[in-house]
């Protein structure tokens, strides 16, 4: 069984998969729209999430997740009863692209300090 990813991470399991490598998904619909998740190697992604595609030779998936999280994409959702983010809203966003080695350094440093930040917020 493979995990099924919806708008806010794993929502269940299915006998089939539609991605065959870790994939960055962005919640598209609902209270958690704009949330990001990195899937397991084999997973099913519903239409409640965007599948990101990018050149893995130039972009670290972990760095891209951190960057998208910092953009607070939820704030770009429509203001309806059921929040929705459209591709038209997020596709034009320009992002800085440091060299791959710098992306890895950023991810490593953030991973190092997150336990301290988590302790401060508890």
Language-model features and meaning:
Residues 92-122:
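Amphipathic alpha-helical coiled-coil/heptad-repeat segments
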Residues 1-2:
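Polyanion-binding catalytic cores of nucleic-acid enzymes and NTP/SAM-utilizing transferases
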Residues 6-69, 74, 78-91:
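A short beta-sheet element
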């Amino acid at each position: 069984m493979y995990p099924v990813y919806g708008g806010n991470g794993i929502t269940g399991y299915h006998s089939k998969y539609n991605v065959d490598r870790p994939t960055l998904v962005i919640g598209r619909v609902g209270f958690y729209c704009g949330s990001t998740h990195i899937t397991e190697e084999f997973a099913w992604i519903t239409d409640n999430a965007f599948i990101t595609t990018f050149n893995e030779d130039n972009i670290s998936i972990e760095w891209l997740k951190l960057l998208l999280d910092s953009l607070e994409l939820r704030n770009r959702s429509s203001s309806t009863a059921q929040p929705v983010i459209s591709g038209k809203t997020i596709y034009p966003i320009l992002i800085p692209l440091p060299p791959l080695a710098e992306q890895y350094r950023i991810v490593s440093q953030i991973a190092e300090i997150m336990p301290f930040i988590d302790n401060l917020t508890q």
